[in-house]
Amino acid sequence: MPDVDWNMLRGNATQAAAGAYVPYSRFAVGAAALVDDGRVVTGCNVENVSYGLTLCAECAVVCALHSTGGGRLLALACVDGHGSVLMPCGRCRQVLLEHGGSELLIDHPVRPRRLGDLLPDAFGLDDLPRERR
């Protein structure tokens, strides 16, 4: 298990939430993640008038991960605009699985949880036919 400074990640996530574009819900979300090379990447939610096109903060973290050099996510904190811990939605859990695997630690109000515990029996690379991998 990686040594994670959860307070630092929550603080970075709260700062990221300050940049959220949320004119419809007014519900700012920020996320921050520790990368396997020691970097911290952040993201915020960006709403769209066509609600289904809204981008979650966790997806923005994955974009930041790849636009700053790639790597694997080790730990992620997601918070609202006041710094209260939030859990990623199901869609985001699936996206995070691709970039951190089942061992990715997700901040939780009680204790950090493995993504594999939050998304059991997830669809993954092994579910694709071999010729598509």
From Swiss-Prot:
Database matches in PROSITE patterns: CYT_DCMP_DEAMINASES_1 (PS00903), CYT_DCMP_DEAMINASES_2 (PS51747)
Tell me a Gene Ontology molecular-function term this record carries.
cytidine deaminase activity
Could you state one GO biological process linked to this protein?
A: uridine biosynthetic process
* InterPro entries reported in the protein's UniProt record: CMP_dCMP_dom, Cyt/Deoxycyt_deaminase, Cytidine_deaminase-like
- UniProt enzyme class: hydrolase
Q: Which cofactor does it need?
A: Zn(2+)
User: Could you tell me which Gene3D superfamilies the record lists for this protein?
Assistant: Cytidine Deaminase, domain 2
Binding-site list for substrate: 45-47
What are the entry keywords? Hydrolase, Metal-binding, Zinc
EC number(s) for this protein?
A: 3.5.4.5
Q: Which SUPFAM superfamilies match?
A: Cytidine deaminase-like
> Keyword Iron on this protein?
no
Q: Where is the CMP/dCMP-type deaminase domain?
A: 4-126
Active-site annotation = 58
Question: Which residues does Zn(2+) bind?
Answer: 56, 89, 92
| Catalysis performed (reactions) | cytidine + H2O + H(+) = uridine + NH4(+); 2'-deoxycytidine + H2O + H(+) = 2'-deoxyuridine + NH4(+)
Which PANTHER family did the record assign? CYTIDINE DEAMINASE
Q: Which family does it belong to?
A: Belongs to the cytidine and deoxycytidylate deaminase family.
What exactly does this protein do?
Recycles cytidine and 2-deoxycytidine for uridine and 2-deoxyuridine synthesis, respectively. Catalyzes the hydrolytic deamination of cytidine and 2-deoxycytidine to form, respectively, uridine and 2-deoxyuridine.
Q: Indicate the quaternary assembly.
A: Homotetramer.
The protein in question is named: Cytidine deaminase
Instruction: Name the source organism.
Output: Mycobacterium tuberculosis (strain ATCC 25618 / H37Rv)
